[in-house]
Amino acid sequence: MDKIEVRGARTHNLKNINLTIPRDKLIVITGLSGSGKSSLAFDTLYAEGQRRYVESLSAYARQFLSLMEKPDVDHIEGLSPAISIEQKSTSHNPRSTVGTITEVYDYLRLLYARVGEPRCPEHQVPLKAQTISQMVDKVLELPEGSKMMLLATIVKERKGEHVKTLENLAAQGFIRARIDGETCDLTDPPKLELHKKHTIEVIVDRFKVRSDLQQRLAESFETALELSGGIVVVAPMEGDGEEQIFSANFACPHCGYSMRELEPRLFSFNNPAGACPTCDGLGVQQYFDPDRVIQDANLSLAQGAIRGWDQKNFYYFQMLTALAEHYDFDVHTPFNKLSKKIQEIILHGSGRTEIEFKYINDRGDIRLKKHPFEGILHNLERRYRDTESNSVREELAKYISNKPCSSCDGTRLKIEARNVFINDTALPTIVELSIADALTFFQELKLEGQRAQIAEKVMKEINDRLQFLVNVGLNYLNLSRSAETLSGGEAQRIRLASQIGAGLVGVMYVLDEPSIGLHQRDNERLLQTLTHLRNLGNTVLVVEHDEDAIRMADHVIDIGPGAGVHGGMVVAEGNVEEIIANPNSLTGQYLSGVKKIAVPEQRTPKDAKKTVELKGAVGNNLKNVDLSIPVGLFTCVTGVSGSGKSTLINDTFFKIAHTALNGATTATPAPYRSIQGLEHFDKVIDIDQSPIGRTPRSNPATYTGIFTPIRELFAGTQESRSRGYQPGRFSFNVRGGRCEACQGDGVIKVEMHFLPDVYVPCDVCKGKRYNRETLEVRYKGKTIDEVLDMTVEDAREFFDPVPVIARKLQTLMDVGLSYIRLGQSATTLSGGEAQRVKLARELSKRDTGKTLYILDEPTTGLHFHDIQQLLSVLHRLRDHGNTVVVIEHNLDVIKTADWIIDLGPEGGQGGGLIIAEGTPEDVAQIEASHTARFLKPLLN
């Protein structure tokens, strides 16, 4: 079987297509956004491959796996088990890091446990096992005549009553033991609590230190070591003298610091054996941040410098008034004019000083009470800790920030794990290195003799995995980077690297635009990785718009000709030459150069007086960057992956602007020195790829605000007025007009254990979401359900006489979404589509010409033709006087920009500098810029 046969695929918008796909080849599926590429790749081929594999398992195993819906297809032959690597961002678990996802960290733990050298944290000397004679000598160094006892640890911090243990010790002839620090008689031991942790140490010998004790001590040590498994404690019998720990395992000769045998879990921050006890292995501590609590330091306490403690909140404000009387300050003085001492007292409390507070109840009775003032920060902490209301907790969480844990300095590990070294390098140092530097470290690491032999296999696994990460262009990440902070493209390429590491053969991989977020420079390495997967003997199916990927494919499938209802057919298939030769293929026309995105004749000139100047940005890897953005221009921020684009624009510039222009209270920008020029804008809008709604009830009509005027139109018809229907009657989210059998969903979810949940159309409303009475109301001959089922294109014509609706529909068409249905569930929109719905919503708002738009990789999921449409929209925004800032790798976008800011020169620590800025023509001349190298040929 050397091909996959697909017959009659009708998933989503696919129009009963038949396909023959070669196996063990690199296949690229391309076409307009929304043409049906993902429906073919993910919802048909992957879903069926996955479903068949899962159905071969037992019913018991199936209940733990999420099953795919059976695709609407007549039959598929020649499928392999399928693995999909999608754009979904990875886990939201704060414990997930790049190291743990890629399994590199597991091998590092094993390596450190097997060949690491533990050291004493205080004296930095290697921990060595002590012989009995060394132990005896150490005891004899104590002052002559000291009364000491020698103890063997039998139970350490373990729950239970330990009756048997104590009986055994007595039977062996031991008389006394120390239990939880108290000495007691073994003939009558205390009863221990079952659910508490206990430590039991048996007293092997009691002696006064004398020089002739050698023989006796040696025998006692031998007995004790045998009982305890290698650790003996020598403690004074009277007073609080210091105890000495001796170890036949590992111990520091200076201070007796010792530790148990090294094992991999000691280096895991997800295991109590290795996690820092202060932060539980998270590396950060949460605290109420004064900068967030103080809303505006220029205001006085009475005016609301601290939200929730102003005059409107009588209970809390009377506390501040009493505080002001006691310390003699004025609640009407601006907060930043109060002395440092007073500010400290307000935030952190009055310590032990008691203050007289007046409490007035509802009846107006006054009660006087004297007690210390707890401080606003402690008050918030207490309320956060004690509340059972989620809404209160969410509200208070806005004032919380994270700081590196004070005990482990953010390394997440216990002190023992932080002090194990391989050639003077500890594990936390390695996970902080970039992946490229870590690879160099392990390639150059030289171990001696037996250690080299033990480490050989583990090192090979570590090197291979790091090499794969470098190959997919992630050399700039470090292993300790939290998975939450990765972009969709990075997360996908990490999963890709893990798959190559698995080395499977005969599998069908389905990938969704792996080139997202990758600079042209790194694209080549990614494509080599894909061909490597193919050469292992796998079928690699890639949904991709990148020209290099299409040209490199063994087989290209072009889906189209349009998007949505106008798509769903195979327009062209074959190798690249066949696609180019096919006159029907839009992709072919762009590849051959018949159609192309032109370089603009002239660019909008920069007005030197109108710029935004951000100085001294130092977030993440930024090296004191000064950013200057021209107002009223279309600016592209470029640079290799990891060079600092997102940190500079999203984490610093956008958050400052969001706070200053939109009044956001919880956006904390990355550190910077100063900013000037925001007065040129009245608002800032950030348009990203996150979903527009996570429930099937959210749809383009509700999101863009078209649904409200549509419901008002229906409520205004003669029929509605005679029945007394309000606009709410036409909402499927509230009781009244919706079908109650399915609560306005149109479908009913039937849970099938062991099989995927089945959604069946509701029998009562036949999937129309509304009850019969509501559907009797028609506007221009259409019911509300028929309107929701219209495509944007049809609705634009239908509502042409209604300007408020027509304008919003026109903007949806302008961003290339003419094919989506008004009532289409938000969960079925791709990332690129969701971003364009957001863009359309912003475009349809009244345009002041003073808006700052920030877009992060808007070309994700877009075909050449879609990019052309997107650019005309962005250029239109700019022509109205707005400022557009785009983070982008796509050269078609970069070459049409008015201004480019290029970061680099490399990713990670090798980046964080602006290395070129100016018009595309200026930037193309700069040698140091990787972007320039690829941009230059396109401008000539």
Swiss-Prot record:
Biological source species: Vibrio cholerae serotype O1 (strain ATCC 39315 / El Tor Inaba N16961)
Descriptive protein name: UvrABC system protein A
Classification via HAMAP family: UvrA
Chain sites annotated for binding ATP: 31-38, 639-646
Residue intervals of the ABC transporter domain: 309-586, 606-936
GO cellular component, one term: cytoplasm
Function, in words: The UvrABC repair system catalyzes the recognition and processing of DNA lesions. UvrA is an ATPase and a DNA-binding protein. A damage recognition complex composed of 2 UvrA and 2 UvrB subunits scans DNA for abnormalities. When the presence of a lesion has been verified by UvrB, the UvrA molecules dissociate.
Family: Belongs to the ABC transporter superfamily. UvrA family.
Biological-process GO terms, alphabetical: nucleotide-excision repair; SOS response
Gene giving rise to this polypeptide: uvrA
Oligomer and partners: Forms a heterotetramer with UvrB during the search for lesions.
Keywords, sorted A to Z: ATP-binding, Cytoplasm, DNA damage, DNA excision, DNA repair, DNA-binding, Excision nuclease, Metal-binding, Nucleotide-binding, Repeat, SOS response, Zinc, Zinc-finger
